[in-house]
Amino acid sequence: MSCKKQRSRKHSVNEKCNMKIEHYFSPVSKEQQNNCSTSLMRMESRGDPRATTNTQAQRFHSPKKNPEDQTMPQNRTIYVTLKVNHRRNQDMKLKLTHSENSSLYMALNTLQAVRKEIETHQGQEMLVRGTEGIKEYINLGMPLSCFPEGGQVVITFSQSKSKQKEDNHIFGRQDKASTECVKFYIHAIGIGKCKRRIVKCGKLHKKGRKLCVYAFKGETIKDALCKDGRFLSFLENDDWKLIENNDTILESTQPVDELEGRYFQVEVEKRMVPSAAASQNPESEKRNTCVLREQIVAQYPSLKRESEKIIENFKKKMKVKNGETLFELHRTTFGKVTKNSSSIKVVKLLVRLSDSVGYLFWDSATTGYATCFVFKGLFILTCRHVIDSIVGDGIEPSKWATIIGQCVRVTFGYEELKDKETNYFFVEPWFEIHNEELDYAVLKLKENGQQVPMELYNGITPVPLSGLIHIIGHPYGEKKQIDACAVIPQGQRAKKCQERVQSKKAESPEYVHMYTQRSFQKIVHNPDVITYDTEFFFGASGSPVFDSKGSLVAMHAAGFAYTYQNETRSIIEFGSTMESILLDIKQRHKPWYEEVFVNQQDVEMMSDEDL
């Protein structure tokens, strides 16, 4: 379609409509409300990098009309419920009949009640979630032809925290090769080390939330997600894939034709920055080096600021201009802080101990994963907050054990992707030993004829005051890994937190403003936890923590994490000590403790002498 024709299809703006949403959707005029077959408005080029929105749809369905096909489009009926806080429209179910060729947003705007709510919630984002016939959070650009007859949706409004550009537009769908619509679902939280967040809307970035993505047959998976408009822009350039049921991989280049009704997670692969191609002309390469460096630094303001600080620091401290002083300064500034090497004996011991570390996963109201380990006999230990994620919100505690027994599985052999969910154990419908304050929970494996790995408990070993520790777990739901990290002594916790908060504020103030010194008071003086630096974040909760000799000393629980440039970073991480967990079990669950630990001597955990 020519630009001239595109402009001829634009309609006047209804100034009474929500101005924020108008940036993405053209309001429906009274003439359009009475004409179900009205063509769609405002078509923009797909290649326009400005054409992005926060959570609203970016694609309208506007099929091309052939001269021989002049029949009137059929209507489609859906039911709309307004979930708003005032009585006027609260929980009203509205019947909506409109042309199936129109988008959901255009159809909704024919309802006076919806238009009033848009006007009432100016500056907020409208979210539409399917409840019957179609599920999850729906793209407002989806054509009604994709909806089943009689489908039901619920409308809510979310306060927008992002600042949208004034020139944002919506996309037309003139380039589709097929009129057959395919709907599939994407979990709002991605998996993988590099980028956990994949959606723009903060309200959608929660566990259990899923987005209904629509596409047309012949399009690729990457086309569908990038054109959807609700996902972050890195999906256009980075390498990623879809994971189905934790055992099937679909690359983003695959067609969407067979994806109808299926659920996926987005796994983002670590993006490697390609090295610059070698210059054909060495002299030209030399001439361009300085210019290239300046261009790179200009793209990263924080890098430029930090480099200027380092240079200024060198100028202040370098009083003696000799090579020895310069070497000492470099060694002090950039040298390693903590030795993280281990003897071969300890490494071999850790490999043996890793056999008892399990990948715990579930599929209930939500899906998720965590880490656990064999504690004693058939009993495994994990974090209490993991149980909260498994059972979901609003469930009676009396039903927790049943839910756990139905949906939780554990495998100890997940060291390669093919072994992710093989040879697993179910757990008993039993949930009695736990503590929310210390964040631990004991579950019991259900015997199935497989050999249970050796128990890791072999007495109480005090946590090290400093030095090196090892964490074994499944961060981000990935294959089993070991992380060697440094203990932050209790006396240095407050100072370390303060230093890191200040440094993060200087680097990226908008990302760490939610943390203050008060945020860390709960762990700064808490003797029941051990603090350390680690790159184990989501999915590693419940990982055993070993000292430098291979003795079990704690269980990794949580940390103060934040997201910067789509990457997860941390101020400080911590875990509950085994000494505190055992003492709490002995005091609060004495009968169980005596039954399970009777006649067990408090001997040291396996050490390198056992090899």
Curated annotation (Swiss-Prot):
S-S bonds: none
Pfam families, per database record: Trypsin_2 (PF13365)
Modification after translation (UniProt): Autocatalytically cleaved; activating the protein. Autocatalytic cleavage takes place in trans.
Residues the record marks as site: Cleavage: F334, G335
Gene Ontology CC annotations of this record: chromatin; cytoplasm; fibrillar center; nucleoplasm; nucleus
Positions of the catalytic residues: H385, D439, S541
Stretches for region Interaction with SV40 large T antigen: 336-611
Motif PIP-box, chain ranges: 16-28
Top-level taxonomic group: Eukaryota
Effect recorded for R569H: In KCS2; enhanced autocatalytic cleavage
GO molecular function term, any single one: peptidase activity
Stretches for region Disordered: 44-73
Cross-link named Glycyl lysine isopeptide (Lys-Gly) (interchain with G-Cter in SUMO2), sites: K20, K30, K65
Predominant location: nucleus
Domain comment, as recorded: The PIP-box mediates the interaction with PCNA.
Disorder cited: Kenny-Caffey syndrome 2: A disorder characterized by impaired skeletal development with small and dense bones, short stature, and primary hypoparathyroidism with hypocalcemia. Clinical features include cortical thickening and medullary stenosis of the tubular bones, delayed closure of fontanels, defective dentition, small eyes with hypermetropia, and frontal bossing with a triangular face.
Known function: Single-stranded DNA-binding serine protease that mediates the proteolytic cleavage of covalent DNA-protein cross-links (DPCs) during DNA synthesis, thereby playing a key role in maintaining genomic integrity. DPCs are highly toxic DNA lesions that interfere with essential chromatin transactions, such as replication and transcription, and which are induced by reactive agents, such as UV light or formaldehyde.
PANTHER family listed in its UniProt record: SERINE PROTEASE FAM111A, SI:CH1073-475A24.1
Subunit structure: Interacts (via PIP-box) with PCNA; then interaction is direct.
Protein name as catalogued: Serine protease FAM111A
Organism name: Homo sapiens (Human)
Gene: FAM111A
